[in-house]
Amino acid sequence: MTARARLRRLHDAVARGTAAAIHRLPVLEAPFLAAGRRAGMVASVRVFCGRAASELARRWQEDAASHRILRVAGQSIRLDVAEFYAHDHFFFGQPFEPGLAAFLATWLRPGDTFVDAGANHGYFSLLAARLVGPSGRVIAFEPHGGARERLQRHLELNDLRDRVAVHPFALSDQSGVATMHQSHHNALASLVPDQSPVRHLVSFGNTFEVPTIRFDAWRAQHAAGPIRLMKIDVEGAELMVLRGMPDALRSGLEAVVLETAPDSDADRLLRDAGYTVRTLDTYEDGPENRLYTPRSLTM
């Protein structure tokens, strides 16, 4: 065994021991979190803390004790800190999609309309609801029943139910019924799991049926009017959503944020439709949050 391998084994053993101690003595949780969130932590210490945090989260999850109510950008959200999207925020204070959150804060105004396609547990719907105020509208689409229930609970927790309309549809290129693929990760599901940007992190297994609707059809039925911003994050089905809203893309949308890769089919569709693009957030080995605005709009 090499010296590096021996050191790695030692680090793993100490990390497991640290997690076991915190698991037995909850009073140690606060100082551990403070250490993990300290700015300027050297890389080796962060790696050690990361291993200990993962082991601790696993133990909490086995005890059905891994859910925490977190304060994120002024919103109260109950999340499972063992799941990847909440893990680093809880243990290391890393923000959720900071570029997109910062853009919302500068772009949305009181009275605006925000559409959240793939709202999940509702972080961006909550943030937008605060920004558009009681005179604005937030329209959230979330077909996954469990995620939609969490979204509704978060609206109640933050006293924002009157500002957010929640719909059970999956936006798509046709209206009807489609098969959604459930991941072992409770908050994620996709119409096209082989195109999901997190397919290398999670596996998709069980399926269930969901109602689908073209956004143009929904918009015509509800006389939606001008939309200041639409966020589309639908686990690989972004192109299907865009193909169901050509009228909205021609008029009625001031900006679109898409989770997609540069030069993807969805990216090319928007650029061919006359939208300019800039990146808000980038992720290692993953898609980007990309902002699209009509060329006629000066930002």
Enumerate the language-model features and the residues they cover.
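Phosphate/nucleotide-binding beta-alpha loop and adjacent structural elements of enzyme active sites
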Residues: 2-299
